[in-house]
């Protein structure tokens, strides 16, 4: 099974990893909160390319930071982001310099994105579903209820719209295969 995220170690990961093996979630949350997404959020909400409102973007940033926190707490788990978090992650990756620096700050390594998880047949889809269920379980352990339409209304409903890529939450929609919904 391919993992959704893969890590490429930097030149000196041992001391970094040893430090975070003894860290608690508050310390990790504090480190994640040092990452500045203001430029990314401006692009998404105010630039000529803007497609999000500020409330949606703020919500996405909070959820993405939770995703990063979980990845730090459980580096061997294949987390599956929500569609909204996945979109924010994609935008973060596009700023390659900042993304690489942020990954090094948080993980001591580059976190690769594997956008094909769950599209290669039933077994791969089942692996995606199992990883998503584990993501929800660990999310709820650390942050409370996982965002749903009932809890977060339109923000979550917008986040759950059919997207034309397959690297986020499992879905029975045939759009899991790129181009199928067009």
Q: Which role fits each region the language model picked out?
A:
Residues 2-182:
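Intrinsically disordered, low-complexity, repeat-rich regions
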